[in-house]
Design a protein with these regions (language model features):
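Short, intrinsically disordered N-terminal pre-domain segments
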Residues: 1-32
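Noncatalytic modules at the cell exterior or secretory-pathway interfaces
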Residues: 112-131
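Surface-exposed ligand/attachment interfaces on beta-rich extracellular proteins
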Residues: 27-38, 50-67, 93-95, 127-130
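Hydrophobic beta-strand segments within beta-rich accessory/binding domains
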Residues: 55-61, 71-77, 120-124
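Short beta-strand segments within Ig-like beta-sandwich modules, predominantly Fibronectin type-III
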Residues: 99-103
């Protein structure tokens, strides 16, 4: 059985009056089971150099992705400029996607995704700086 885990740790000694450390681990499983993930569409890297909203994930282009499965999405802004950002959204680029986050240089996000929703994952860069 495959075992895939996602872990986050956020430590800080000066964010509050006392030191803070938050840590959490999730074991990723196949939808509706205790079985580890057995499928992946793989990892892909895309270089963005446009300030035009773009589909990062177009659900219609992914075979078998319309079923209610346990999908996870990881997005990272590999840029180093802290004044440039990517706005990540859910929805159709011909409409108004719902913004779910803004990733500055070095930022990342990991979120569950319902492929059954038919909604795409979009990216809108703050400018045409390649990242």
């Amino acid at each position: 059985m495959a075992t895939t885990t996602a872990q986050i740790t956020i430590p800080s000694s000066d964010i509050a009056d006392n030191a803070v450390s938050i840590s959490n681990t999730a074991t990723l499983t196949t939808a509706g089971t205790a079985t580890g993930l057995t499928e992946t569409t793989g990892l892909a890297r895309r270089k963005m150099a446009s300030s035009t909203i773009t589909d990062l994930i177009t659900i219609a282009n992914i075979a078998g992705f319309s079923a209610a499965k346990s999908a996870k999405v990881y997005i990272r802004n590999t840029g180093t400029l802290t004044d440039k950002y990517a706005i990540i959204g859910i929805g159709d680029i011909t409409g108004t996607p719902t913004t779910i986050g803004r990733l500055y240089g070095g930022d990342w996000m990991f979120f569950p995704y319902d492929g059954n929703s038919g909604e795409d994952v979009t990216i809108d860069m703050s400018d045409a700086t390649a990242t």
